[in-house]
From Swiss-Prot:
This is Subtilisin-like protease 12. GO terms for molecular function: serine-type endopeptidase activity. The gene is SUB12. Residues 35-115 form the Inhibitor I9 domain. Keywords: Glycoprotein, Hydrolase, Protease, Secreted, Serine protease, Signal, Virulence, Zymogen. It is an enzyme of class 3 (hydrolase). Glycans are attached at residues 123, 136, 150, 249, 305, 334, 385, 393. Its EC number is 3.4.21.-. GO terms for biological process: proteolysis. Residues 125-397 form the Peptidase S8 domain. Its main location: secreted. InterPro entries: PCSK9_ProteinaseK-like, Peptidase_S8/S53_dom, Peptidase_S8/S53_dom_sf, Peptidase_S8_Ser-AS, Peptidase_S8_subtilisin-like, Peptidase_S8_subtilisin-rel, S8pro/Inhibitor_I9, S8pro/Inhibitor_I9_sf. The active site is at residues 157, 188, 343.
Length: 397
């Protein structure tokens, strides 16, 4: 049964004379009247604070000067490793003033964000064996880089069942920016977390696990909620001294978004290795975010026979393939289940990336390059202009 599907949203760039860029989209997936505003590089914290005060005054003034539908105004502000932005609902006059402000780089609509996978109840598991052997059809998992001791995994997803016994007491609830239901209703986040850090199905078997819920019980979110979750995770890691010792998996996406790409890249630069799913639309990954950001490790899905899964996105932005078809992992309430998708492939890279980062003392932005050096050139029928590199953990097996 299909749970959710990545949306493909094409957008057109409009120019405003002597103003910031307005990145516009077609109506599909756009949340009417809701926007993300990104500041120019080099804007100071003081200038950002002054801009926010100006914005609040402009919003009140424009609402008061005529009869107009109410808009709530500012909802969130972010500073992710110097990337400063905010979101909110604004009327057209306020948006025009924002575009004309000297410190604004661009504005884009807030839009829906979803994850992608299918679930099948079948008794099969093979992913860990494949990524720890150069030859296919092995049946054991071999690792020479440990089990993720002293690492922390942040799952940006539908939430994680922190009481799942396979997490052996290592999981904690971080934040819920999606709804008011502090559980993983759909299982997607618990499944991806199990591949990264579960005892039975995971790679970082001794890592700490943190749930960051950005998708609601229908598997829906938006770019504002996503960036809110990302921002919280960076601040949590900084507060706890975990930067440089943390990994993050992002098995969700939306149409190509400059704001989503920039925020995610800055999060990695702050000190967290990030693995992202390429998407399940069987199209070029350049059309989706955050997988279209070349600085991130974008992961396509492979099959048991070392081919590209029929649903997986492809193209020059793919860094690695990893097992993504019929992957068994954890589900809420101490259950297990099989899911397929690039959502299932990316967690394999997240886990191995954490091991390599810790073992070799790499910066997060160096990890993907190292994984590609270790990778196994095994993928057949990868797709046009797409790598043949399959994730390998360097075990020597």
């Amino acid at each position: 049964m299909s749970i959710f599907k990545l949306m493909v949203i094409y957008f057109t760039l409009f120019w405003v004379v002597n103003a910031a860029q307005l990145l516009d989209l077609d109506s599909h997936g756009v949340i009417p009247g809701a926007y993300i505003v990104v500041m120019k590089n080099g804007v100071s914290s003081h200038q950002f604070s002054s801009h926010v005060r100006w914005l609040k005054r402009a919003h009140r003034r424009n609402l008061a000067k005529r009869v107009a539908p109410f808009t709530e105004g500012l909802s969130s502000t972010w500073d992710i490793a110097g990337w400063q932005a905010y979101s909110g609902s604004f009327d057209k006059d306020t948006i025009q003033e924002i575009l004309n402000h000297e410190n604004v780089e661009f504005v884009e609509p807030n839009r829906e964000m979803k994850a992608a996978s299918t679930i099948k109840q079948e008794n099969i598991t093979w992913g860990l064996a494949r990524i720890s052997h150069m030859e296919n059809f092995s049946h054991d998992y071999v690792s020479t880089y440990g089990e993720g001791e002293n690492l922390t995994f942040y799952g940006i997803d539908s939430g994680i069942d922190i009481h799942q016994s396979d997490f052996t007491g290592r999981a904690r609830w971080g934040i819920n920016v999606a709804d008011h239901i502090d559980i993983d209703c759909i299982g997607h986040g618990t499944h991806t977390a199990g591949t990264v850090a579960g005892q039975s199905f995971g790679i970082l078997k001794k890592a700490s696990i943190v749930s960051v819920k950005v998708l609601d019980c229908y598997g829906h979110g938006d770019t504002t909620k996503y960036i809110n979750g990302l921002n919280w995770a960076i601040n949590d890691a900084k507060k706890r001294g975990l930067l440089g010792k943390s990994v993050m998996n992002i098995s969700l996406g939306t149409g190509r978004s400059r704001a989503v790409n920039e925020a995610t890249v800055r999060a990695q630069e702050a000190g967290i290795f990030i693995s992202v799913a390429a998407g399940n639309n069987a199209i070029n990954a350049e059309f989706l975010s955050p997988g279209s950001a070349p600085e991130l490790c974008t992961v396509a899905a492979s099959t048991r026979n070392d081919t590209r899964a029929y649903f997986s996105n492809y193209g020059a932005l793919i860094d690695l393939f990893a097992p993504g078809e019929y992957i068994r992992s954890t589900l809420p309430h101490n259950r297990t289940g099989i899911m397929s998708g690039t959502s299932m492939a990316a967690p394999h890279v997240c886990g191995i990336g954490g091991l390599i980062m810790a073992a070799e003392g790499l910066a997060p932005e160096q990890v993907c390059r190292r994984l590609k050096e270790l990778a196994n050139p095994a993928i057949k029928y990868a797709g046009f202009n797409t790598t043949d590199k399959l994730l390998y953990n360097g075990s020597g097996a």
